[in-house]
Amino acid sequence: MNPVEKLALLRAEMKKRHLDAYVVVTDDFHASEYVGAHFKAREFLSGFTGSAGTLVVLPDAAALWTDGRYFLQASQQLEGSGIELMRMGQPGVPEIPALLRDHVPENGWIGFDSRTISNDFARSIGEKTREKHIRFAGDEDLVDLVWANRPALSCEPVWELDVKYAGLTRREKLAMVRGKMKEMGASVFVIPSLDEVAWLLNLRGNDVLFTPVFLSYLLLEQDTATLCVQREAVSAEIEAHLKSDGVTLAPYDDIYRLVAALPTGTRVLLDGERANYRILQSVPESAEVLDRTSPIQLM
């Protein structure tokens, strides 16, 4: 299929759900700089292979935003696709929230996979479209419905980094981060960033090109830690080592259920630039969100 045919299929799914726009970003669920083949939804739909870009699909139009590194490449690869190239930073080029405000009707719906949209990006769209009472539908990955033979999520084996290379043991690092949590008044720290999880637990993987990390989230409390990961990626030996350091395993997608089950009064630390929108939406109203730069970034 070419991009025109793929967009037609996507629009058919949008129409079934009464969506007035659908946003497809380049990110995975963890705001990683590089993404695996499973997450190349924007590339699949548009044919544009650059590493940065966001596609917005409307019922009768589509546009792709990218930066100056890719203006020439994008103009060539989008030719004949029906997708307008939006050259970011150039005069007269609207930002994505402004275009959505101008093209989505009053009380309309904007769809996206909320696991791939950052909280900050969703907030910027919400602020720009609030006056028109535009709503979000983020529970479905519509690209998955039109992408036959989509590559599966990467699930390469996780391995342990020896402390002589890591510098500190897993227990020492966990104690350091828990100390920072206390200073910040947080009872729970949701860690979605793959590099931070890998550093904190002295684990490595091969799920992302050019980066020795593995698909995972960590829910850290003062007395417990839950690693949400594809279980088949973790050997029984590594699971036992983690358990001895107070880290238990849960299925990869359980992060949303675990966050939603946090008790009343929980103070949840997370980094809004790195946490996806679905995580933020999962936090109970009875809990308090502390949107701060991750303390791990400062270690």
Residue ranges and their predicted role:
Residues 1-299:
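Terminal domain-start leader segments
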